[in-house]
Amino acid sequence: QTLAAQNFTTATDSYNTAVGFEAGNDITTGLKNTLIGGLAGDAITVGGDNVALGYTSLGTNVGGAGNVAIGAQALQTANPGATSSATYNTAVGFKAGLSVSTGVGNQLFGTFAGDLITEGTYNVCIGYDVGSSTQNLTTGSKNILIGYKTSGPSTQSNAIGIGDTVTAVANDFTFGKASNLVTNDFDADANWSRSSDERL
């Protein structure tokens, strides 16, 4: 049933590739989509330049464009409406970016990476369960989270967290592990929480 809903008399789409049960099933005017996997991109109608590889990846995307979803359920709930929101997101990994609905420009790599982001924009999440643990990044923007279960502010922005189970704070650079952290508040005085132990 791939591309089954198309009326080849009236449809104006072109350059689409769909492989899998109901992949790209509803495309009407969307262009240059590559959809591989059962139900991959099956709600796309007008969206274009999307790549979906994996079961239900980009499953509810209707009009979003320029998204890359690789992995089962990656970006599954992106753009459930007919608008052009949820664009230019990249999600690689099982359930990476699962809940992104209208977010733009998120770069998510790893199993469960950024899977609770909904409207957040321009976030970078790299690692297992990043952005999903302590504070559950949802609508915050421009956060950079790297490591194992590193999380950021749910609704705030400009947090950088690197390490093991680190909880990043808005306008702070935090790295280390949960029990032993070093921070720098770059919003105010940019002082480090610990001075150097270098011997002069």
Which positions does each model-derived feature cover?
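Glycine- and small/polar-enriched repetitive beta-structure motifs of secreted/surface proteins
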Residues: Q1-E198
